[in-house]
């Protein structure tokens, strides 16, 4: 009789992937990266175990938007003080801090639990074409779309 495979920390093999964000659409890239971080692209996926891989995203400043989202999409944060609501458009955030734009999008697609926080720490986003993770020997990852 066969038993169902259950992944645990001892039998997970993690890889490092590099994804070039140049010319990619924000949402399509984010959803695919979130699936890699969760481990859903593997046959050993187990919902309650972190089976995901590490992802390095380069050229985050060259991400693209569809439609008028660059002007219309707004990001909000609040300081918890009266009148402390801050807002910034997606285009302005892309110019000032493209790494935060991608991190916000991807981490919003991960679970809001301790496991989701752990999975989110395997994401590394860089605005330029260089990254300091050459020692991990990352593989290039081709997106489906």
UniProtKB/Swiss-Prot annotation:
Superkingdom of the organism of origin: Bacteria
A single Gene Ontology CC term: cytosolic large ribosomal subunit
Keywords: Ribonucleoprotein, Ribosomal protein
Oligomeric form and interacting partners: Part of the 50S ribosomal subunit.
Family: Belongs to the universal ribosomal protein uL13 family.
Stated role: This protein is one of the early assembly proteins of the 50S ribosomal subunit, although it is not seen to bind rRNA by itself. It is important during the early stages of 50S assembly.
Name recorded for this polypeptide: Large ribosomal subunit protein uL13
């Amino acid at each position: 009789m066969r038993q169902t495979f259950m992944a645990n920390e001892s039998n997970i093999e993690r890889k490092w992937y590099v994804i070039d964000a140049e010319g990619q659409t924000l949402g399509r890239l984010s959803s695919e990266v979130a699936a890699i971080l969760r481990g859903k692209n593997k046959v050993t996926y187990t919902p309650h175990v972190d089976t995901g891989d590490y992802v390095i995203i380069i050229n985050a400043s060259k991400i693209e938007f569809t439609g008028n989202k660059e002007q219309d999409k707004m990001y909000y944060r609040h300081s918890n003080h009266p009148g402390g609501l801050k807002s910034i458009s997606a285009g302005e955030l892309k110019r000032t801090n493209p790494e935060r734009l991608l991190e916000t999008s991807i981490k919003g697609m991960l679970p809001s639990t301790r496991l989701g926080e752990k999975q989110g720490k395997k994401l590394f986003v860089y605005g330029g074409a260089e990254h300091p993770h050459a020692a991990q020997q990352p593989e290039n990852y081709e997106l489906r779309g």
